Amino acid sequence: MSIMMLPMEQKIQWVPTSLQDITAVLGTEAYTEEDKSMVSHAQKSQHSCLSHSRWLRSPQVTGGSWDLRIRPSKDSSSFRQAQCLRKDPGANNHLESQGVRGTAGDADRELRGPSEKATAGQPRVTLLPTPHVSGLSQEFESHWPEIAERSPCVAGVIPVIYYSVLLGLGLPVSLLTAVALARLATRTRRPSYYYLLALTASDIIIQVVIVFAGFLLQGAVLARQVPQAVVRTANILEFAANHASVWIAILLTVDRYTALCHPLHHRAASSPGRTRRAIAAVLSAALLTGIPFYWWLDMWRDTDSPRTLDEVLKWAHCLTVYFIPCGVFLVTNSAIIHRLRRRGRSGLQPRVGKSTAILLGITTLFTLLWAPRVFVMLYHMYVAPVHRDWRVHLALDVANMVAMLHTAANFGLYCFVSKTFRATVRQVIHDAYLPCTLASQPEGMAAKPVMEPPGLPTGAEV
């Protein structure tokens, strides 16, 4: 610690040369290594600390407590003089001879603060937290920038109502779709119906595992108070169902592309047995690719910055479920549309089959409905986490609701495009309603068949 002798009209400057000098000014030498690091950090980011604390930005601390403003020139130099004079009496005598005694005395009184009578019954302010201090003051703590509360669920009960309606309407509709497609696949033995049946089965699994078990049971009923092993095992089934649904749609896309662009090869290669084997291979691959997501972290509970494993799993999910499938959809659908336009320019009628129209509708619907979820997931990973920003929390809730809508929207698309599907659905409903009607009629009132086998004449004997 050094004192520079200057003329009387200039100020005495004091330059700290080590952490010991700073702790000496603060009035104690018993600082731990953690406190030294805090002092060093405060020395580097003084402006940042002042900008984050309304308490330090106030003009003064009222109520008889210490004045903690950062004072330029006179007061701060006097404060430094007083501490130096206490350590060096010789320097004190020398300064008195130069006429600086009044300045040092004022600074010394400022260092000691108000008198005991003036400060009786008033709270004291600690400049830096020490190991013996229980915590920061309440006013300081309320403006501490590093502490952030968990973001509230702004949507409230709307997701619960939405998923309940989606499950109550979507699951019966999906079961009806599966029965109708099973009849069409058995009757026609066309590969496209087998692929649509497998796609519907995957949507049913998504509704049961994700919508019912995930959002409603774990989220709403149990409030996420579920054993971690159960949650992680459910993650495998959820991601496997998502992968199966998307990649079966890719099989349908490739089948339609081959049927339109390479019809001879499609007729020679397509068969019900080969179609079933392709579906079984995709389902097995989907289950295997869902196993790594056992370590998937819930974004509502993920309070730390994403680790390497988290980033790998989130990027794998985005690539497997959205980016790669959308790339395949874009290429194959563009080739199909280009083929149909060429037929129109050559004078032939560009006939668009029902399966092709259903394919274009399914892929377009999937691309639009899943885009918000993927965007919010990447935003959560690199910009703002869900648990800190209520807007990201709300965006993730809405994105999940929109993404789950595709599991029930396919039925309306099938009915809108295909007259054969509508007729099959009516037949399924009629067949299910007729036994219930016959069972509800009294005994002896059942309708007789229109055509009766011929019997023996009355009075005739065998």
UniProtKB/Swiss-Prot annotation:
Biased composition (Basic and acidic residues): 106-115
Tissues with expression: Exclusively expressed in the central nervous system, most abundantly in the ventrolateral region of caudate putamen, the habenular nucleus, the zona incerta, and the medial mammillary nucleus.
Segments on the Cytoplasmic face: 174-195, 255-278, 338-357, 419-462
Extracellular compartment residues: 1-152, 217-233, 300-316, 379-397
PROSITE patterns the record matches: G_PROTEIN_RECEP_F1_1, G_PROTEIN_RECEP_F1_2
Pfam family membership, one: 7tm_1
Origin: domain of life: Eukaryota
One of the GO biological process terms: G protein-coupled receptor signaling pathway
Subcellular location: Cell membrane
Membrane-topology descriptor: Multi-pass membrane protein
GO cellular component, one term: cell junction
Keyword Transmembrane in annotation: yes
PANTHER family reported for this sequence: G-PROTEIN COUPLED RECEPTOR 142-RELATED (PTHR46272:SF1), G_PROTEIN_RECEP_F1_2 DOMAIN-CONTAINING PROTEIN (PTHR46272)
Family indicated by similarity: Belongs to the G-protein coupled receptor 1 family.
Name listed for the protein in its UniProt record: Probable G-protein coupled receptor 142
Organism: Homo sapiens (Human)
Gene that encodes it: GPR142
